[in-house]
A protein has these predicted regions:
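N-terminal alpha-helical targeting/anchoring segments
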Residues: 1-134, 149, 153
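TRNA-recognition modules of translation machinery and tRNA-sensing kinases, especially anticodon-binding
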Residues: 27, 130-428
Length: 428
């Protein structure tokens, strides 16, 4: 959500931003806000004028009574009563206008960074750089679900009977590697100076509305029936939500937090879930990182955060690349975002494993989060988030890139301490 004053003073900039995101249907929203804002400001001005007139009349009534001019005083009292009735009407209108404006403003996308490439959708995202040499295997690599089955490591049929498509049982060595990766990710981020957090796995509707657009909520979030609670789609939501309605002391910035949590998603978007596999599913686990910082520090943190993901994946011998998200691929709250994609030797292409985003002050504004500066003035912080790792999707890249021709999977050195020194796993 952008600043109302900015929209009022720069409507053409806001409209061009909407066009750059290929959301032309939202263009009328800008004029709607401007019209409602003008009406609200006129209402506020009239209310202020009436209050001033009321105060003036009240003083005059006292003077008239002191002079014995009772009839004139009574007439003025009637005038004050009429003004009071009108003032009550105006005061009732104010919150109505503000709520109408707020709801429309929530639908207007954030102003994207000037460095973001203009493009309609993810097909126009731009490769920035690669890290590690892509593997071209001399043997056939099975589809990941089939590969996991060779280690007795997955049961999709059982999960389908229990919960339907989009769920899984991981077992044995595959499950152990999953747990080892998450433990390693936790320690990796702690060593980067982040505070480890175990957050709530449910959030109130007001927090969900504060961290994402309504469209994203509808496509992603599971609501608890009869409760004002949603299952989190990522722990970013509950970690950022921790600071809602709070005044943060500037000297405590940056806030750098990392957490591991289950994530629950409807996946109602264009891709949907897989019939068989663990690439796009309803339930998974993820190590996340968030930063709350001064606006001027945000881009430095953005670059640090995505580089942490690259470093993490490279330590597991997985080649990756950075992909700059174009304007049309950015969610409405995002100022700038990039994906980290892992190499799939089986498919001979990259696929998304991490997403790093600078949200500007949008989440802070929605959640009423403020910072008290050293000079005593209040301002909105910037919020950023990034995936460290999200198994089991990451396991696809892990197994494919560490698979040998004899069917064994090599355990990278970084992971061995979390697997009791194990150096490889073998087919069952």
């Amino acid at each position: 959500m952008i600043d109302l004053k900015f929209l009022r003073e720069n409507p053409d900039v806001v409209k061009q931003n909407i066009k750059n995101k290929f959301q032309d249907a939202k263009l009328p929203l800008v004029d709607e806000v401007i019209a409602l804002d003008a009406e609200n400001r006129a209402t506020i001005q009239e209310a202020n004028d009436l209050r001033a007139e009321k105060n003036k009349c009240s003083k005059a009534i006292g003077a008239l009574m002191a002079q014995g001019k009772r009839d004139e005083a009574e007439e003025m009292k009637k005038k004050v009563a009429e003004s009071a009735a009108r003032l009550a009407e105006l005061e009732a209108l104010e919150p109505e206008y503000e709520e109408k404006i707020r709801k429309i403003m929530m639908r207007i996308p954030n102003i994207i960074d000037k460095s973001v490439p203009i493009g309609k959708d993810d097909s126009e995202n731009v490769e920035v750089q690669r890290f590690g040499e892509p593997i071209v295997p001399s043997f056939e690599i099975p589809y990941h679900a089939d590969l996991f089955e060779t280690f007795d490591g997955i049961d999709l049929d059982g999960a389908r009977r229990v919960a339907g498509n989009g769920f899984y049982y991981l077992m044995g060595d595959v499950a152990r590697i999953h747990s080892a990766v998450t433990a390693y990710a936790r320690d990796f981020m702690i060593n980067k100076g982040f505070t480890y957090v175990i957050p709530p796995f449910m959030i109130r509707g007001s927090v969900a509305e504060g961290v994402m657009s309504q469209g994203d909520m509808d496509a992603m979030m599971y609501k608890i029936e009869g409760e004002d609670l949603y299952l989190i789609g990522t722990s970013e939501h509950s970690m950022i939500g921790r600071f809602c309605d709070q005044i943060i002391a500037e000297e405590t910035l940056p806030q750098t937090l990392t957490s591991f949590s289950p994530c629950f998603r409807k996946e109602k978007g264009a891709h949907g879930i897989e019939e068989r596999g663990v690439y796009r599913i309803h339930q998974f686990e993820k190590q996340e990182m968030i930063v709350i910082c001064k606006p001027e520090d945000a881009m430095d943190w953005y670059n640090k955060m995505w580089s942490y993901s690259v470093e993490f994946f490279r330590s597991l011998d997985i080649p990756v690349r950075q992909l700059e998200c174009c304007s049309g691929d950015l969610a409405d709250l995002k100022v700038k975002s990039c994906d980290i994609e892992a190499w799939s030797p089986r498919q001979q292409k990259y696929f998304e494993v991490c997403s790093c985003s600078n949200m500007g002050d949008a989440q802070a504004r929605r959640l009423k989060m403020r910072v008290k500066g050293a000079d005593g003035k209040m301002y909105l912080p910037f919020t950023l988030n990034n995936t460290v790792v999200a198994p089991p999707r990451m396991l696809i890249a892990f197994f494919e890139n560490n698979l040998k021709a004899d069917g064994t999977v090599t355990i990278p050195e970084a992971l061995r301490p979390y697997l009791g020194g194990m150096t490889e796993i073998k087919r069952k």
